[in-house]
């Protein structure tokens, strides 16, 4: 009875509970190793996803492998190419030349080049302008008046005219801004640029016998530098491939370890079930033996009584008589 109670007390854990516990432990370990990246995001169920590629990633160990993949690199390059034109400054478009603007600019330049007139010439110009205005107004005099007026005009100081006092003193008017169209500016830029035939890059490869000098003149890497750069790129690619393979191997090892643990748990559960079956069989065998013993005990008690009665009957008879022991 004590063994049966002990067997009932040891209960086997259900397989579903063990699977649930294993999933919770895996989920907790995944939560602890969160990926810190602007493109990494987690769903409501805790699944790691790439926001740039919109693709799920199994776990944090494979995030570096996904980042080094071709799909992620192409998406990142496409994003950079889309965002780059937004920051480039737009070329300034200026209006084209007009004939009126060209003529006005040439006249202002000529006026600026001429020397300022002398004071005597300035007075003569002022008096001449005043006389012209008087004739236009209709003031006509005789010849004598003209002569006397001429003498008086020679001695009289110059009077104010219709022109402003600082007409000739003021400098030349500022030239209007000359506008250029986009095509003109482009043409000027093309003229300012050096023609391709005069550039060092236009020289053919192997123009100089010395490969180092040839590379320096053409402003390219020397063969040694090129080999070193290619070697560094090769090593970088190999490191990336090795890191990706290490991540895959680590993931495979983790999955294999979890599978082995699940197999061991299932094997333990089968062993527990077998132990329980054997204990149940043992209990049934014991109960049968007890019942058989209980049935055999009264029969064993009756047999000694019969033997004693026969012995007493024999002893009471005359053993010397004929046929007494028959």
Curated annotation (Swiss-Prot):
Residues 1-11 have a biased composition (Basic residues). The keyword Iron-sulfur does not apply. Pfam families: zf-C2H2_jaz (PF12171), ZNF380_CC (PF23406). GO terms for biological process: cell division; mitotic DNA damage checkpoint signaling; mitotic DNA replication checkpoint signaling; nuclear DNA replication. The gene is znf830. Residues 298-309 have a biased composition (Acidic residues). Residues 224-295 form a coiled coil. A zinc finger (C2H2-type) spans 50-72. It comes from the Eukaryota. GO terms for molecular function: nucleic acid binding; zinc ion binding. This is Zinc finger protein 830. It is found in: Nucleus; Chromosome; Nucleus speckle. InterPro entries: Matrin/U1-like-C_Znf_C2H2, ZNF830-like, Znf_C2H2_jaz, Znf_C2H2_sf. May act as an important regulator of the cell cycle that participates in the maintenance of genome integrity. Keywords: Cell cycle, Cell division, Chromosome, Coiled coil, Developmental protein, Metal-binding, Mitosis, Nucleus, Zinc, Zinc-finger. Residues 13-36, 276-286 have a biased composition (Basic and acidic residues). Residues 83-108 have a biased composition (Low complexity). One of its GO terms (cellular component) is nucleus. Residues 1-37, 83-214, 237-257, 276-309 are annotated as: Disordered.
